[in-house]
């Protein structure tokens, strides 16, 4: 499933794997020839990755001659979309939860912008600082300022705290049916002796009265046997809040029976990963006719660029 998950160029890659002879015959074997026939570049104003200001960016963003492209691809592919399959899955309601940046976050975003300017102008050696480091720090900052520095204050209106409020309220409302929730964060996974949003969320929920045994980290299930046991507990409702990353809790996670809410605490790099996350709850076998997917974003940070 999902052969085109991140970039439109993946369609070309799939055709090279499956239809090399066809591409050769039609003189489309080189990417430039294929792209000029089936792709259209568009220039749009988008947020700069460091979170400050805007920039014009040209991207390969639209398919062109789409019926002709699909006719060629269908010689090797039998395509079924979720709409065509009409599977008995719950209706998903999406909610964007926006947190305002703190003064500290604003200052740090400005620092990221200054670092990016130095990198772009070549004023700093790439081994010392580069855009990968800057975007990595930007993602951490967008999630919680304490990941950058654990001594910074825990802001009551941060997106982590907004998420905790949400999880608790849904947990409380779903007590009778023992409804369950998934929380996704690819950053700040649990590690000994280091600040982690996983531990922070768990401790805050416990302090509000959620039993510790009803909260689990996917990282604690480090074997297939333990994973199966954990998923069985979520399906039965004995574990009601499961926190994990896309890599460990994406494809292959089958615990949808009582899932009522999914929380995207951070935004993964690839659009296909968001689909994988959503596929855990929008799934056959879920007893709820409607489910909720919450996406948390910190305004004016790298978060906004990613989403």
Where are the language model's segments positioned?
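Short regulatory helix/loop adjacent to the ATP-binding pocket of P-loop NTPases
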Residues: 7-15, 253-255, 306
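Conserved Helicase C-terminal RecA-like lobe
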Residues: 87-249
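Surface-exposed alpha-helical interface segments used for non-catalytic interactions
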Residues: 9-12, 71, 161, 199, ...
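Conserved RecA-like P-loop NTPase helicase motor core
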Residues: 3, 206, 210-305
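An acidic site on a long C-lobe helix of protein kinase domains
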Residues: 3, 7-10, 65, 159, ...
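Inter-lobe coupling linker of SF2 helicases/translocases
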Residues: 3-4, 17-153, 169, 293-307
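Protein kinase-like catalytic domain
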Residues: 18-19, 171, 235, 282
């Amino acid at each position: 499933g999902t052969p085109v998950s991140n970039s439109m160029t993946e369609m070309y890659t799939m055709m090279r794997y499956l239809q090399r002879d066809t591409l050769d015959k039609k003189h489309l074997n080189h990417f430039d020839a294929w792209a000029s026939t089936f792709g259209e570049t568009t220039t749009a104003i988008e947020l700069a990755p460091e979170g400050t200001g805007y920039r014009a960016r040209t991207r390969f963003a639209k398919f062109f001659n789409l019926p002709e492209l699909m006719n060629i691809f269908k010689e090797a592919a039998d395509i079924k979309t979720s709409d065509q399959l009409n599977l008995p899955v719950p209706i998903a309601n999406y909610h964007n939860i926006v947190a305002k940046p703190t003064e500290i976050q604003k200052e740090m975003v400005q620092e990221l912008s200054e670092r990016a300017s130095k990198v772009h102008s070549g004023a700093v050696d790439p081994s010392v600082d580069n855009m990968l480091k800057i975007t990595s720090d930007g993602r951490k900052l967008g999630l919680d300022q304490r990941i950058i520095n654990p001594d910074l204050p825990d802001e009551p209106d941060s997106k982590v705290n907004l998420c905790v409020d949400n999880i608790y309220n849904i947990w409380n409302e779903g007590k009778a049916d023992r409804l369950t929730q998934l929380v996704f964060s690819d950053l700040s996974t649990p590690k000994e002796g280091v600040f982690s949003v996983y531990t922070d969320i768990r401790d805050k929920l416990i302090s509000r009265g959620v039993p510790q045994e009803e909260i689990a980290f996917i990282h604690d299930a480090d074997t297939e046997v333990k994973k199966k046991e954990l998923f069985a507990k979520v399906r039965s409702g004995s574990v009601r809040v499961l926190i994990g990353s896309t890599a460990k809790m994406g494809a292959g996670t089958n615990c949808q029976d009582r899932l009522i809410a999914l929380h995207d605490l951070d935004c993964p790099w690839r659009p296909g990963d968001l689909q994988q996350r959503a596929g855990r709850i929008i799934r056959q076998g879920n007893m709820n006719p409607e489910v909720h997917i919450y996406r948390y974003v910190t305004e004016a940070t790298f978060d906004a660029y990613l989403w």
